């Protein structure tokens, strides 16, 4: 089922000539996504402790001129991006940002600096891609 949906989306992209635009945009943003992912991976924080993660995300969003809402008693943030056509349907995109209570032993250059915490779950990737 998932593969059929992917093929259908790919067909629509090719049919509308958007595949090249998608590939070009992916290439343009690759280094930024990797930079963000490495930072988030190195600074893994457990659930409800993601203060540095939230600060990083807020900073990056604000650099892009995106309004961000934060909450004094909670981690995470809400970024609101308005479309060019004005009011219309609303799309919600979200990413988890918490790490798991696991000691990283990967040996990669960007390994977690947090004792007993690492992104073995992919949340660092999800948040980076969403940025």
Residue positions per predicted region:
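Alpha-helical metal-binding/catalytic segments enriched in His/Glu/Asp
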Residues: 113-131
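Acidic/His- and Gly-rich active-site-bordering loop/insert found
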Residues: 20-119
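Enrichment for repetitive, rod-forming helical segments
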Residues: 11-14, 44, 101, 130
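Short, Lys/Arg-enriched N-terminal segments with co-localized hydrophobic residues
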Residues: 3-19
């Amino acid at each position: 089922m998932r593969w059929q949906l992917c093929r259908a989306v790919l067909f629509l992209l090719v049919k509308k000539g958007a595949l090249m635009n998608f590939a070009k945009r992916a290439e343009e943003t690759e280094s930024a996504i990797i930079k963000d992912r490495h930072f988030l991976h190195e600074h893994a924080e457990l659930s409800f402790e993601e203060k540095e993660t939230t600060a990083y995300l807020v900073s990056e969003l604000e650099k892009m001129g995106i309004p961000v809402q934060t909450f004094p008693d909670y981690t995470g943030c809400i970024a609101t991006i308005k479309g060019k056509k004005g009011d219309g349907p609303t799309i919600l995109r979200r990413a988890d940002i918490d790490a798991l209570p696991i000691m990283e032993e990967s040996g990669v250059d960007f390994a977690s600096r947090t004792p007993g915490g690492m992104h073995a779950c992919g949340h660092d990737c999800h948040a980076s891609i969403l940025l």
